């Protein structure tokens, strides 16, 4: 199976990964060590909804890997993969959020936030910590605490910033049937 990307999709991955890195450098600390409030997941969620799961996956994988390599901690693959999976999961449900059709009402906001909260809970509360325990032999209590705090922090930041980004994006789209021939 051959996957072909359009120029628009390639640009979305490049810009999305770059934004992931730049915004990811802004760290708002939490009481849990090595865990901070991250705002880049709002942009990743936006791109996942607009361009779909593969673009969301690539933005998270590439962006997080570059960010980790720049900050000097080394590549932490379980969390890099979790970032990609967050974009994948959100993108899989994009058809339920109607921003492409210039619609992002309360129903869409509710659906988007339900999807992203469940995705955050899954990838940060379960998959990333489980990977840390299995692959890196990290202490389960520590990594699950980090994962739960990261999931909550990311869920709140995406609920606020992601919703605002999607509202702004929906406002730029032409509503189906709104154009009439004179």
From Swiss-Prot:
The keyword Manganese does not apply. Keywords: Cell membrane, Membrane, Transmembrane, Transmembrane helix. It comes from the Bacteria. It comes from Streptococcus pneumoniae serotype 19F (strain G54). This is UPF0397 protein SPG_0438. It is found in: Cell membrane. InterPro entries: ECF_substrate-spec-like, UPF0397. Disulfide bonds: none annotated. The chain crosses the membrane at residues 10-30, 46-66, 73-93, 109-129, 148-168. It is a multi-pass membrane protein. Pfam families: ECF-ribofla_trS. GO terms for cellular component: plasma membrane. NCBIfam families: PRK13661.1. The keyword Transmembrane applies. Belongs to the UPF0397 family.
């Amino acid at each position: 199976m051959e996957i072909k990307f359009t120029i628009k999709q390639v640009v979305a991955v490049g810009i999305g990964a770059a934004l992931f890195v730049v915004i990811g450098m802004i760290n708002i600390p939490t009481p849990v060590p090595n865990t901070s409030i991250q705002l880049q997941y709002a942009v990743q969620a936006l791109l996942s909804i607009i361009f779909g799961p593969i673009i969301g996956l690539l933005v998270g994988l590439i962006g997080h890997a570059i960010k980790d390599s720049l900050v000097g901690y080394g590549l932490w693959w379980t969390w890099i993969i979790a970032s990609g999976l967050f974009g994948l999961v959100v993108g899989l449900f994009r058809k339920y959020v109607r921003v492409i059709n210039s619609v992002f009402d309360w129903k869409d906001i509710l659906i988007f936030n339900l999807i992203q909260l469940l995705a955050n809970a899954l990838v940060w509360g379960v998959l990333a910590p489980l990977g840390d325990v299995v692959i890196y032999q990290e202490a389960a209590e520590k990594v699950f605490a980090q994962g739960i705090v990261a999931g909550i922090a990311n869920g709140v930041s995406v609920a606020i910033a992601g919703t605002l980004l999607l509202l702004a994006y929906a406002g730029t789209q032409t509503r189906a049937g709104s154009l009439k021939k004179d």
